[in-house]
UniProtKB/Swiss-Prot annotation:
Residues carrying Phosphoserine: 8, 19, 138, 213, 243, 324
Coiled coil, from the record: 273-310, 368-443
Biased segments, Polar residues type: 183-201, 248-262, 313-322
Gene: CFAP97
Residue pairs linked by disulfide bridges in the UniProt entry: none
Residues that bear Phosphothreonine: 133
InterPro entries xrefs: Cfap97/Hemingway (IPR038791), Hmw/CFAP97 (IPR029488)
Family: Belongs to the CFAP97 family.
Protein name in UniProt: Cilia- and flagella-associated protein 97
Disordered: annotated segments: 1-322, 393-413, 506-527
Length: 527
């Protein structure tokens, strides 16, 4: 209640307004608000002077206000005076001079509707347990809260006005700042009027709840932005910048009810549906076009029929002309086809005649080249040649026909003895060759073809040669064997023969010389 006494005595605390506006300057980040705050301070000084002049009139009306406070303490505050205030504050934006005069009247009306101090602690106990219970401390805190909330709400009003016009933003900001300064100096209900201007809801018109428990405005769940601002901002430790951040993003974000994958699927399905609809529309258009064509054809036919009925003579003449033209065209086509057929037949006949002429001319022309014989003689010669060819082919087919033919001709001719000897010698050579060939074919690889075995054979043969005289034939074979050193199979065969001959020679002489036993490994080539 000290606040009301200070106002009645005509003393205004300018430092309080300066501190409040300095806090508002800290909250405002834009350069536009800095300029407008300077203008607002000058105007608030003028408003305070006007308030000091009008305090004399307000003292006379205190008696009336006390009666009004008693009636308002017993009954709840009505909505009509606040609505009147809203109307007056709304009209104050038209001109600055009219707004100041009306705000003076609004202060008088606010004093009428102020609650009694008896009702203040009751509202504190009922609505809010976190705030102070003393009337003075609670009112001082309320004063700070409302001033901060008002100063925090001003940037939003400025932002809305700046988006429209710069001139309107300057006028509205000056009016709002002047009204806020005058309201804070007179009473706390000025903040309620500002709040009711931004969000006129019936739940906000309880003065006790708005002054002492600002959280109650947020608890009932009001959806207007003014209610959110009044519910979130009036905290003692919060700064102006934090309050601006909380005020800007108040509206709930619209979360999609469908996941992005489903939305893509729905989009694809919608695209398919649109394509199907387009195809159906195209089909319908095609069908409609076909139906239109049919209808047009029917209409044309009906029109032709009507014309034929009205003009039978003309139609008969036209049909006669058409029939004659068709007949002529058909005749031309028939003549053309007949001509083509005749030409094809002629070409085919010529093609058939040409090979026949060649076939008949060949036998007549060929015998004329040989003028030594007549045609009959040539034919007889051909027949004889054909017969001889057949006989020769038959003889060639029979086996042994060549050997039989010379024997059947006659006895063999007589030969001289020299020829006979040559023939016999030749036959003997052939027989030996055949026998040698058979031996070579039957020969298998020998076992003793190693170097050590060949050396043993060589030394043994050399011992045989040095111990007894041997014939020239044996010596020649041994010399050949020693030179070849058993490299070939023929040499091994000759060595075996030489060994046999040596044995036979020793046996015939009857010498008592002892011979080395033949190793069992050594074998002849033909065994």
């Amino acid at each position: 209640m000290d606040r009301f006494d200070d106002i009645s005595e005509g003393e205004v605390d300018h430092s309080f307004f300066d501190s409040d506006f300095e806090e508002a300057r800290k909250g405002d980040s834009s350069s536009v608000f800095d300029k407008q705050d300077d203008d607002a301070e000058e105007r608030t000084d003028k408003d305070t002077e006007n308030v000091n002049l009008k305090l004399g009139l307000q003292r006379k009306e205190d008696d009336l206000t006390e009666k009004g406070t008693e009636s308002s303490g017993k009954t709840p505050p009505e909505e009509h005076p606040v609505e009147g205030d809203n109307a007056q504050t709304g009209n104050s934006s038209s001109s600055t001079t009219s707004s100041r005069s009306k705000l003076g009247n609004a202060r008088v009306e606010h004093k009428i509707h102020l609650p009694t101090p008896n009702s203040l602690p009751q509202t504190v106990k009922d609505g809010e347990h976190d705030y102070y219970t003393d009337g003075e401390e609670s009112t001082d805190d309320e004063k700070k809260h409302h001033v901060r909330s008002k100063s925090a709400k001003l940037p939003n009003n400025f932002k809305k006005s700046l988006s429209k016009k710069y001139s309107r933003s300057s006028s509205s900001s000056s009016l709002s700042l002047s009204s806020s300064s005058s309201d804070t100096g007179c009473s706390d209900t000025g903040s309620d009027v500002g709040l009711s201007d931004s969000s006129p809801s019936p739940k906000k018109h309880l003065p006790g709840a708005t002054h002492l428990s600002p959280k109650l405005k947020y608890k009932p769940g009001e959806k207007s932005p003014g209610a959110h601002a009044s519910g979130t901002k009036p905290k003692v430790g919060d700064d102006a910048e934090e309050s601006e951040d909380t005020v800007t993003d108040v509206t709930p974000l619209s979360t999609p009810d469908i996941s992005p994958v489903q939305s893509f699927e729905l989009g694809a399905s919608s695209d398919r549906k649109m394509k199907v609809k387009r195809q159906e529309n195209v089909r319908q258009e095609v069908y409609e076009n076909v139906e239109d064509l049919k209808n047009n054809s029917k209409s044309l036919k009906s029109a032709k029929k009507g014309k034929e009925k009205h003009e039978p003579s003309l139609t008969s003449k036209s049909t006669a002309l058409d029939s004659s033209l068709d007949h002529r065209y058909k005749q031309k086509v028939l003549h053309d086809t007949m001509d083509l057929n005749h030409l094809l037949k002629a070409f085919l006949q010529l093609d058939k005649k040409r090979p026949q002429k060649h076939h008949f001319d060949q036998p007549s022309v060929a015998p004329r080249k040989n003028y030594s014989f007549t045609r009959e003689e040539v034919r007889q010669i051909d027949r004889e040649n054909q017969r001889l060819l057949k006989e020769l082919s038959r003889q060639a087919e029979k086996p042994g026909s060549k050997s039989m033919i010379p024997r059947s001709t006659g006895p063999p001719p007589k030969l001289y003895h020299s020829a006979l000897n040559r023939q016999r010698e030749q036959q003997r050579i052939e027989r030996e060759n055949l026998a040698f060939l058979k031996r070579l074919e039957a020969v298998k690889p020998t076992v003793g073809m190693k170097r050590s075995e060949q050396l043993m054979d060589y030394h043994r043969n050399m011992g045989y040669l040095s111990s007894s005289p041997i014939s020239r034939r044996v010596r020649s074979t041994l010399s050949q064997y020693s030179s070849l050193k058993g490299a070939s199979r023929t040499s091994s065969a000759t060595s075996g023969l030489s060994c046999k001959s040596e044995r036979s020679a020793f046996n015939t002489t009857g010498g008592g010389l002892l011979l080395r036993p033949k190793p069992p490994n050594v074998r002849t080539a033909w065994l």
